């Protein structure tokens, strides 16, 4: 995950802040809000309004009612951190060949990153290094023994990345990732799409010396589905797993990608997310 220091972050995002003593407070507030901590629990009175107004003026936070509370109805707009919402594909540059059939793989990410994660001269390479390991872990949930990494390595298949869009956006902690496997035979081409609704949380992990590792510390699969059969991917995976091991695949192990930190968000965004050929209410899978 990308490592950034406070000075670099400040030089990029705090250029219009005149009060130098305010900048460390803004950084502290932003990184804690990324990790789900409400601004009102960090500051009170005049300090709260000073920090809130400064963060708002440089577009690091926004006020919105476009969220789902886990237990209570939406009552009022809340403050959320801003960041970057990126749509991109990781895909194979040539087919994988097996038993007279050829296969291409495309992993379509729609993901939110906090400001600071993409401070780099090579954004595509940064995204690839961050998300190829996640793509491989999701691919391995399609079937027992499946490995995107092994597929590429055994036939020396290059993979690359294509960025579709990159925009500033309010925090997302639920999004959909699609894996598209295209099977090419002599006379037919068939695509198999697998959708994963993911819940995730970022953090700025303090490395010491004003350096921070920006990482997804919690990543869970809320729902995985074959768009061709509309069946649960876990159920399909588990059928094969039972044949091999005569027991069920542990559900927590299947649905958990990262659990380096607890998931502490109580508010979920966005309220709706794509699933196969439709858009569903996020709350159905929480």
From Swiss-Prot:
Source organism of the structure: Acidianus filamentous virus 2 (isolate Italy/Pozzuoli)
Name used for this protein in its record: Uncharacterized protein ORF286b
